[in-house]
């Protein structure tokens, strides 16, 4: 009986250990599922805040100054001349890009909150997010480039084309345009980071 008990105990213990190792290997040995991390949600919340701030700053880019017009030397009159973001197609394009990005960031942030409560993000969801993030990053980069070119001409002018600088007169207007362009650049960088983060999550899932 002692011999039977001695041989039975190791057998059952080895069996239990084998089951435990098999369950542990299935849990820890396989590739970890691609979970929607909190970093994804944080970046999308940051994207929404930055794009919304850039949008508000751009919409409020308005200034009216009194500019002297010579009638007959030495007579002149002062007339109000406004400067608005709607006067430039490049700034209108920036406005449209910011509106689209702000809406996109809000929708994806809400979706990220829902995905955080689930067990894992599907590979299909990650793939679509990568495509959308890259697309909006390209849109924001192009809009930032066009707005930056207009802002630079307004700041420095261009003597070859005889475009005079206006920021020495419309200081407030130029500050708004410059700030909005800088925030739009940050939004484009955040979108690139999101694309890399989702691509890494998809890579981990495929391993």
From Swiss-Prot:
GO cellular component, one term: plasma membrane
Bilayer-crossing regions: 41-61, 90-110, 125-145, 177-197
Entry-linked Pfam families: CASP_dom
Extracellular side: 62-89, 146-176
PANTHER family referenced in this protein's UniProt entry, alphabetically: CASP-LIKE PROTEIN 1U1
Keyword terms of this UniProt record: Cell membrane, Membrane, Transmembrane, Transmembrane helix
Topology with respect to the bilayer: Multi-pass membrane protein
Subunit composition and interactions: Homodimer and heterodimers.
Subcellular location: Cell membrane
Organism of derivation: Oryza sativa subsp. japonica
InterPro entries: CASP/CASPL, CASP_dom, CASPL
Protein name from the UniProt record: CASP-like protein 1D1
Residue ranges that the UniProt entry lists as topological domain Cytoplasmic: 1-40, 111-124, 198-207
Ranges in a coiled coil: none
Source taxon at top rank: Eukaryota
Family per similarity comment: Belongs to the Casparian strip membrane proteins (CASP) family.
């Amino acid at each position: 009986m002692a011999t039977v008990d001695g041989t039975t105990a190791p057998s059952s213990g080895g069996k239990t250990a084998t089951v435990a190792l098999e369950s542990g290997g299935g849990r820890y040995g396989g590739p970890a599922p691609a979970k929607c991390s909190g970093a994804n949600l944080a970046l999308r919340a940051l994207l929404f805040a930055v794009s919304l701030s850039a949008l508000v700053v751009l919409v409020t880019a308005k200034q009216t100054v009194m500019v002297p017009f010579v009638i007959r030397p030495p007579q002149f009159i002062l007339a109000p001349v406004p400067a608005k973001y709607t006067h430039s197609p490049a700034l209108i394009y920036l406005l449209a890009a910011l509106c689209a990005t702000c809406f996109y960031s809000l929708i994806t942030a809400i979706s990220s909150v829902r995905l955080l409560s689930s067990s894992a993000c599907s590979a299909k969801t990650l793939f679509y997010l990568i495509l959308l993030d890259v697309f909006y990053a390209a849109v924001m980069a192009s809009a930032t480039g066009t707005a930056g070119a207009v802002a630079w001409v307004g700041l420095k002018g261009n003597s070859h084309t005889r475009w005079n600088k206006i920021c020495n007169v419309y200081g407030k207007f130029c500050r708004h345009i410059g700030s909005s362009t800088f925030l739009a650049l940050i939004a484009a960088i955040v979108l690139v980071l999101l694309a890399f983060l989702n691509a890494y999550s998809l890579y981990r899932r495929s391993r």
